[in-house]
Amino acid sequence: MQYRAIATCVSLLLFYQQLPAAGENLIVSQIATASTTPADATAKVETQRIYEVLVKMLDRWNARDLDGLMSVYWKSPSLLAVIDTEQFDGWENLYRSYKNQCRNPTNMGIVNSTRVQVTLLKPDLAFGIVCWTMRYPENAHASEVVGTTTVDLEKFDSEWKIVVLHTSFTEM
């Protein structure tokens, strides 16, 4: 309940600002203030770090590097991932599923983000949205896939990790 109240307050006070150093389609949600404080600067740094985690997730997928991909997830039995209609409880179960489904790397496709949005809810809790398209250049008959991934990230020590993920997609 407390997180919902924080998210509601944040969404009412947000403005969206492009970060020039981000390079892609990063939308940063921040509380509007008249001046920049040390807390604002810290929030910007943390938001950029979270963005980098989400970009790493996409990059590792495109590199067909499942170990690198899994490094962005919280290595815990409490990790929760819902991909389309399947639910995976725990890091090991998600990893095993990826290994089984991605035996042929050409079936993984190439993912491109169309939007990455990061909202820092608390100093150690964030929400992210990644809108993406996937192509299969090795398979001329495959459809393009369009999807959205939402993630909750927590900061453990100094590292941001995905603790909850939901992905939905459709073929075009």
Listing of model-derived features with the role each one plays in the protein:
Residues 7-17:
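Bacterial N-terminal signal peptides
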Residues 24-30, 146-172:
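Short beta-strand edge/turn micro-motifs at domain boundaries
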Residues 124-134:
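A short hydrophobic beta-strand element
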Residues 66-120, 143:
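A solvent-exposed, acidic/Ser-Thr-rich amphipathic alpha-helical stretch
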Residues 98-99, 113-119, 132-134, 148-154, ...:
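Hydrophobic/aromatic beta-strand elements that line small-molecule binding cavities or substrate pockets
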Residues 138-140:
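Outer-membrane beta-barrel domain signature
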Residues 1-7:
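Bacterial N-terminal signal peptides that target proteins for export
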Residues 20-72, 76:
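Short, low-complexity N-terminal intrinsically disordered segments enriched in polar/charged residues
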